[in-house]
Amino acid sequence: WNLLKKEIISKLKTVENLTELNFPEDFHDRLISFFSADEKPANKRVTKDIVEFMCEGDVFDIGGSLWRIVCGNGHSPEHCCLYNEEHGVLISGDQAIPRISSNVSVYLANRHDDPLGDWISSCEKLRDTIPNDTLVLPSHQEPFKGLQERMQQLIDDHHAQLNRLRISLKENVQTIDQLRKVMFDRKLSSIDVVLATGETQAHMNYLLHRKEVHKELDSRGAAHYPYPLSSKDT
């Protein structure tokens, strides 16, 4: 986290990164202040000698039972879930939560990536490979069953958000800050604005990667998104 925090602060100090998002000027300093704070639980160090890297498909014997690694992406890189086929249990972490959706964001360090595409693919993988009667143990809220329906619901919810953006963009060319208010039409705290902006950018990157929209920078460097593509861009 400390290394990631330093990279984030470095990126934040590159003003054009925030200018492209069309953030208000005072928000720049507030973001740097948030990531510069040292009193967060996540700042605790993990030493290399207690870290063991896990990969998709690896199997571990834990307490006499075999657990298989199932990786997902989009919320965080290589998010590992643990699946026990014998007992029908999936420790899903943030990859499958019963009533809320994990944040899927573009971060300043990787602002051209397609995390939403990765997230939808990960939801499809869990839907198609884990039995529906599996007991899911999430990192938030209560255990649940019905993983396949829940994964499809998450997929459908993101496609509904994408359609909201498409409809809004057909009416006006907009910036990420404006589109955030289309997706999140309520008052947000400073950190929620960061998360909501990252999620809005993730949805726009999904459309950009599929050539449904394109990006234009104005004289200040703020990004605007015309929709649909003009003939010169096809």
Where are these regions (language model features)?
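Short flexible/disordered coil segments
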Residues: N22-D38, I50-F53, D133, V193-V213
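Short acidic/glycine-enriched loop/turn segments that link adjacent beta-strands
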Residues: M54, S76-P77, S219-A222
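Short coil/loop residues immediately preceding or within conserved phosphate-binding loops
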Residues: G57, G64-W67
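Conserved hydrophobic "DFG−1" position in protein kinase catalytic cores
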Residues: I62, L82-N84, K215, Y227
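C-terminal regulatory/interaction regions
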Residues: R164-T234
